[in-house]
A protein has these predicted regions:
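Elongated scaffold/linker segments in the mid-to-C-terminal portions of large proteins
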Residues: 2-3, 65, 75-235, 306-409
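Short alpha-helical linear motifs
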Residues: 34-36, 274, 307, 328
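C-terminal beta-barrel architecture of Gram-negative outer-membrane proteins
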Residues: 260-271
Length: 409
């Protein structure tokens, strides 16, 4: 058994995903009778989904396949989200938990730009890790800000720093006021094998190096989130349904959510608060999907089938403006892990202000942050960069109007 080959588990999970996609919203060449039309929809090419009875049948089909994966007992969550991504970076197939249902196999020096085009950025040549990497895929300040306190996924997913050379030493540099340029930290040169680090170190100039890191196409956490979604549609957050895996939607969501916290007491209260009705619980699934899967290539397509892509882009823009003018810190403080001040203690960064009992003298360094723009005359981030993001889809104004923008009926 190897996750580098398509297995029955992956086939079941993929069929469930196809059923959910079929039950979701999609753009059509022309309106189809009996289908529901979305609020955000083009008059010529409407966004529609199938009728309620058909959706229920598709949810039941998805439930069948997801339950097959869960009850097979072949796959489990790695108890450590950090170790899950350490193993991926190390190119080690996990034979203990098998959280990854399927990975497209890659070859070092032959294929995969994970860690080069996507991942923590090396900003120029470094003595420790070699040459420059591009880190093209970016996350945003509102996304980093959205994580609940003590969620271990935040600092693994959001790399608000780059690696560079200063005075002959490789150092980590906090990015400062760069709210739309946070790198995806799941692929991280610091966690890769010596073979990969040596490959990068011996690659000259701007030449790409191929990491050989497998492309994971389905994780068990995705199975649990899809299961939670389906069970919520069929039975609500806590109900049971024939053909299920014997766990509720809430229990499936809790398994994914609680894995990210060393202490889950406060999270039980959160899970209870979002399990009061179908709509609230669905919104919690949408949030969990973002916290768990960002950067992996799935979120956009889930938002499309939920018809939330436009809404979430507009929400991100609104959240940024609100927080930039309010909650974002003008300056953030942080400590280093080592005496040479080369490695940042990510858990020390004061994104949400100084902790009780702490003063600025308790920190090694500081940088200007996302809230700094509210007191500057030049507002590059809010007035130039923000309007350009997804402007072809939502327009260049906060209200989502303008050429190319989706229109709410």
């Amino acid at each position: 058994y190897t996750t580098e080959r398509m297995t029955k588990s992956y086939a079941n999970a993929l069929l469930a995903n196809i059923a959910l996609t079929r039950a979701g919203w999609m753009i059509r060449e022309s309106a189809k009778a009996g289908y529901e039309t979305a609020e955000y929809s083009d008059a010529t090419y409407p966004t529609q989904r199938c009728d309620e009875a058909t959706r229920k049948s598709l949810y039941e089909r998805a439930l069948k396949h997801l339950s097959a994966v869960i009850t097979s007992n072949r796959h489990h969550l790695n108890p450590s989200f950090e170790n899950e991504w350490y193993l991926i970076n190390q190119r080690i197939l996990d034979q203990t938990y098998r959280e990854n249902l399927f990975e497209i196999p890659m070859g070092i020096e032959e294929s995969s730009e994970l860690g080069y085009t996507i991942g923590v950025r090396c900003n120029g040549q470094t003595t420790q890790y070699g040459h420059n990497s591009s880190g093209k895929q970016k996350l945003t300040a509102p996304y980093l800000w959205s994580f609940r306190d003590n969620d271990q996924r935040r600092d693994i997913t959001c790399a608000n720093f780059d690696i560079r050379e200063e005075n002959g030493t490789t150092v980590e540099k906090l990015l400062g006021n760069n709210p739309f340029g946070i790198y995806v930290g799941k692929w991280d040169i610091r966690k890769m094998s010596e073979e990969n680090i040596n490959l990068a170190a011996n690659t000259l100039g701007d030449t790409k190096w191929m990491s050989g890191i497998n492309c994971v196409r389905m994780r068990y956490s995705q199975v649990l989130l899809m299961y939670a979604e389906v069970m919520n549609e069929l039975a609500g957050p806590t109900g049971s349904y024939e053909g299920s895996a014997g766990i509720s939607a809430k229990a499936a969501l809790a398994e994914v959510h609680n894995r990210a916290f060393s202490i889950t007491t406060a999270e039980e209260s959160y899970l209870n608060s979002v399990s009061t009705d179908r709509t609230t619980f669905f919104n919690a699934i949408v949030d969990e999907n973002a916290w768990e899967l960002a950067g992996e290539g799935f979120r956009k397509y889930d938002l499309i089938r939920w018809n939330l892509l436009v809404e979430k882009i507009l929400q991100f823009k609104s959240d940024y403006l609100k927080q930039m003018n309010g909650a974002y810190q003008r300056t953030i403080y942080f400590n280093y892990l080592d005496a040479a001040h080369t490695q940042i203690d990510m858990s020390s960064i004061t994104y949400k202000g100084l902790p009780a009992g702490k003063s600025t003298s308790d920190y090694h360094a500081s940088v200007s942050s996302w809230g700094n723009e509210r007191t500057t005359s030049t507002k590059t981030q809010s007035e130039t960069n923000l309007p350009s993001i997804s402007s072809g889809l939502v327009g260049s104004t906060q209200q989502g109007s303008g050429n190319g923008a989706a229109v709410k009926n």
